[in-house]
Amino acid sequence: RAALRLLTQARIPGLVPDVSVPEGAPIARLTLAVHAPELDDAPVSQGLLVAPAPADERPVAAKALSHLTIKWPWLADQLPPHTHLLRLSYGRHGEAEPAVTVEGALRDIRTLTGVTIAAEAVTDRLLARWNGTLPPLPPEYRSRVGALEDQVRPLGGVALTGAWVAGTGIASVVSHARAGAKGLL
C-alpha cells in the first residue's frame, strides 16, 4: 500500500494507478513440537488445507496443517526420534483475529489426522501473528497491476515489486524483485 501511495502522491503525468490493494486477514500460525510416535507414518503426508466454510459449519478452527518434519526431512534429522513439528494456520479473510490455544490446536490435529496427542506430549510451541496478509488475488486485480506496471516501465529507474504486485509467497516476491532489479540494470 505504501508504494501505491507514493506513486499516487508523485503526480506523474499520465500515471493512473487503478489498483486498490485488498484488505488482508489477521493470521496466526502455531507451530508445535510434539513427541508422537503415532505421527511417524505421516497420516496426512506433508499436510492439508481445510476448505472455507461458515465458522459454525467448520469441523476445525485451523485452515491448514503442515507436517513440517515430513515436508522437510532435514528437520526430522535435527530432532529426537518420534518428535514432529506441526504448524497450524488460523485466520481467514473477513474474520476477526483468531483465538489460538494449544488445547484447540490439539483438537484440530485429532480431527484432521485421527491421532490424539496429549498436552504433555507438546515439548515446545511458537505462536506467530501478523495482520494484513493478502488474500488470493483475482485475475482482474492482476490485470490492473499489469496495466500499472506497463505505465511505470517507460519512466525508467522504477520497478514495482512486493506481494501486492508479485502475488503472495516469498518465492514469488523474491523472483519478481530479482527480475525487476535486472530490468533496471
PLM regions: where:
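Mid-domain catalytic core of redox enzymes
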Residues: 1-86, 91-98
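Conserved flavin/dinucleotide-binding core of flavoenzymes
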Residues: 65-185
